[in-house]
Design a protein with these regions (language model features):
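Divalent metal-cofactor coordination and adjacent catalytic microenvironments
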Residues: 1-204
Length: 204
C-alpha cells in the first residue's frame, strides 16, 4: 500500500467526499496526492507542514528578519553573534518576519560606488516552529489549520489527473510515468489554480 507523504495536503478519505473511488484505486489516489502536494510546495517555494526549523541568516540591517517558513507559530531562541536575545526584543509578524525595533545588525562592509555589502556573515541563528497542521495529522486537540483553498487546490489537481487517467484520454498530455507519478500537461494552468499559488507563494 502506498503511504501518504509527510507533506500530503489531503487524504483519500477526504477526496471521497467529492468523488467516489474504488478500494483498489487507493494506491493510485495516494500517489496522485503525493505528487500534487510536492508540486504545490515546489511552486510555493516553501514547506507547509508544521515542523521545527533551524536557520542561520544574513541580516540586511533593517528592522525585519525574513525566515524561510511561515506562519511562525513559536520561536525557541534567537542568537546574534553568540548572544541569545530575550523574546521581548523582537516580535513575530506575518509572512515569516521577525521584527526588531533597533534593527538586525549585519556584519560586513560596503564596497564600490553602489555600496554593495561584502564579506557579510550569517550572524543570526533562529530555531522556530512554523507551518500548518495537515489533514492527515489532525487529532482531537490539534485541528487542521491548512487553508481550505490550498487543500482544495490539491484536490482539484488530483481529480483532474484521475479523471484524465480514467477516461483514457491523452489530449494535452506530454509525458506520464506511473512509477513515480510524473507528468506534464500542454494545457495552461487554470487561472484559479495560479491565483491560489500566488496568494501563498514565497516571493522574496
Amino acid at each position: 500500500m502506498i503511504t501518504l507523504a509527510d507533506n500530503a495536503l489531503t487524504t483519500p478519505d477526504r477526496l471521497m467526499i467529492l468523488q467516489e473511488f474504488n478500494d483498489d484505486q487507493y494506491d493510485l489516489v495516494a500517489m496522485l496526492i503525493n505528487q500534487a502536494s510536492a508540486s504545490i510546495e515546489t511552486e510555493l517555494r516553501r514547506k507547509l507542514r508544521k515542523q521545527t526549523y533551524s536557520e542561520r541568516i544574513t541580516p540586511t540591517g533593517s528592522q525585519e528578519l525574513l525566515l524561510s517558513q511561515w506562519p511562525i507559530l513559536q520561536v525557541d531562541h534567537v542568537v546574534i553573534d553568540g548572544l541569545e536575545l530575550d523574546s521581548s526584543e523582537y516580535s513575530i509578524e506575518d509572512n515569516g518576519i521577525l521584527y526588531k525595533d533597533d534593527g538586525w545588525p549585519w556584519r560586513g562592509y560596503p564596497f564600490g560606488l553602489a555600496y554593495d555589502p561584502r564579506a557579510t556573515s550569517r550572524n543570526v541563528s533562529v530555531v522556530y516552529t512554523a507551518g500548518y497542521i495537515l489533514p492527515k495529522d489532525v487529532t482531537d486537540s490539534d485541528p487542521c489549520t491548512l487553508p481550505a483553498d490550498l487543500e482544495g487546490l490539491c484536490m482539484e489537481m488530483v481529480q483532474a489527473s484521475f479523471g484524465k487517467l480514467q477516461s483514457g484520454g491523452n489530449a494535452g498530455l506530454i509525458s506520464f510515468a506511473i512509477s513515480d507519478v510524473r507528468w506534464e500537461w500542454a494545457t495552461e494552468t487554470p487561472a484559479s489554480w495560479q491565483a491560489v499559488i500566488n496568494k501563498y507563494r514565497r516571493w522574496a
